[in-house]
Swiss-Prot record:
Co-factor(s): Mg(2+)
Binding site for (2R)-2-phosphoglycerate: 162, 349, 378-379, 400
Manner of cofactor binding, per the entry note: Binds a second Mg(2+) ion via substrate during catalysis.
GO annotation, cellular component aspect: cell surface; extracellular region; phosphopyruvate hydratase complex
Gene: eno
InterPro entries, per the entry: Enolase, Enolase-like_C_sf, Enolase-like_N, Enolase_C, Enolase_CS, Enolase_N
PANTHER family referenced in this protein's UniProt entry, alphabetically: ENOLASE
Name used for this protein in its record: Enolase
Pfam families recorded: Enolase_C (PF00113), Enolase_N (PF03952)
Length: 437
């Protein structure tokens, strides 16, 4: 029987050199290991990532309390349970914590256990993780959102918006789409070098040059697409998905530059302009009319519901509007957004909610209500590639996992190549069908 015999956690380091939690789960005949990511720009509504707070050790970012919680409370609570009973395991984790935001044991502790149990269950069952979670119909490789220029909280430069990404939609296979992204990445690097701009990279592997404006960043991306020999789509207002091979996705991370006291969006890193919610929505409408943008994540701040409604009403019929800080992978927040008719997509970060079951519930709720789901990494990552498996398991159709550099990002892309190979003729690359706009 696949009974949990031992659960052991340890403190390891993530891609930024900060501590994070890794968990091992043992049964008599299987083993699972999972490492937990962490974010730089975190939503205030996320589940609690438990840190030690001792400034003399890892600048207060140690996770030994979370590790101890796993090695005592969780180990004792889950021993003897069947590792294949994922929903029961996750229910027990929530009971052991007993708080609405997982502040007692830490979402980082619970997530490590939840994912490691899933991996041990998959190994016991003799299946790949995507097949174990998703069943026989799990066959869709995701369209990647590839971060090529970093700004905002992810880079020390003059760009206000956090991520400028490319999405290869004009292809019939994931491997060809990945090649396209890599070639554009290298074309952009050459373009930056030719202009005497920095090719240093940010937390997620994208370039982080000092530019004169946010507009210069997106214009460089469009130029790099052409330099690499590919065709950028038209602006969404002109039927962008109907033509071209590559579209652009943005993550401004607007909560990071929203001044709640002023109720203004303040472009602190570039030209210092201040925009109201209505002006910010109009700004994104203009960009979607001028550039081949198919997706905007967190175009408005996490609690600016009125601003989100304005933005959705303006461009939600033609641009994917992704809620990250807005929804925080939380079914309750998502249900509120659905009721208010704001956004049309959810970003899915497993550590925002803390268990696999809750993650899958959020994805299911989104799909049932016509919202897309984008499976996502965090800026602080590890070599763990579980999100690649989850993307295929849920047939989400989209994944956001960084640029074409840094092995913590490439681990996910390479795992998807292996899954595509394993699926063979069953593999589906959705291309433009990944979107509902």
């Amino acid at each position: 029987m696949p009974i949990i015999r031992k659960i052991h956690a340890r403190q390891i380091l993530d891609s930024r050199g900060n501590p994070t939690v890794e968990v091992d789960v043992y049964t008599e005949s299987s083993f699972g290991r999972a490492a937990v990511p962490s974010g730089a720009s975190t939503g205030v509504h996320e589940a609690v990532e438990l840190r030690d707070g001792d400034a003399s050790v890892y600048l207060g970012k140690g996770v030994l309390k979370a590790v101890e919680n796993v090695n005592t409370i969780v180990d004792e609570g889950l021993r003897g349970m069947l590792v294949t009973e994922q929903e029961e395991i996750d229910r027990m984790l929530l009971e052991l914590d007993g708080t609405p935001n997982k502040s007692k044991l830490g979402a980082n502790a619970l997530l490590g256990v939840s994912l490691a149990c899933a991996k041990a269950g998959a190994e016991y069952s003799g299946m790949s993780l995507y097949r174990y979670i998703g069943g026989t119909m799990a066959n869709t490789l995701p369209v990647p959102m590839m971060n090529v220029i970093n700004g905002g909280a992810h880079a020390d430069n003059t760009v206000d918006f956090q991520e400028f990404m490319i999405m290869p939609i004009g292809f019939t296979s994931y491997s060809d789409a990945l090649r396209c992204g890599a070639e554009i990445f290298h074309a952009l690097k050459a373009l930056l070098k030719s202009r005497g701009l920095s090719t240093a990279v940010g937390d997620e592997g994208g370039f982080a040059p000092n530019l004169t404006s946010n507009e210069e960043a997106i214009e460089l991306v469009v130029e790099a697409i052409g330099k690499a020999g590919y065709k950028a789509g038209s602006p969404a207002s002109k039927g962008g998905l109907g033509e071209g091979q590559v579209m652009i996705a943005l993550d401004p991370a607007s909560s990071e530059f929203y001044d709640a006291d002023k109720k203004k969006y303040v472009f602190k890193k570039s030209d210092k302009r201040e925009l109201s919610s209505e002006e910010m929505a109009a700004y994104w409408e203009k960009w979607s009319n001028d550039y081949p943008i198919i997706s905007i994540e967190d175009g408005m701040a996490e609690d600016d519901w009125a601003g989100w409604k304005m933005l959705t009403d303006r461009i939600g019929s033609r641009v994917q509007l992704v809620g990250d800080d807005l929804f925080v992978t939380n079914s309750v927040r998502l249900a509120e957004g659905i009721e208010k008719k704001v956004g049309n997509s959810i970003l899915v970060k497993v550590n925002q909610i803390g268990t696999l079951t809750e993650t899958l519930e959020a994805i299911d709720l989104a799909k049932r209500n016509g919202y897309t789901a984008v499976i996502s990494h965090r800026s602080g990552e590890t070599e763990d590639s579980t999100i690649a498996q989850i993307a295929v398991a849920t047939n989400a159709g989209q994944i956001k996992t960084g640029s074409m550099s840094r092995s913590d990002r490439m681990a996910k892309y390479n795992e998807l190549l292996r899954i595509e190979e394993e699926l063979g003729a069953q593999a589906v690359y959705p291309a433009a069908k990944a979107f509902r706009v």
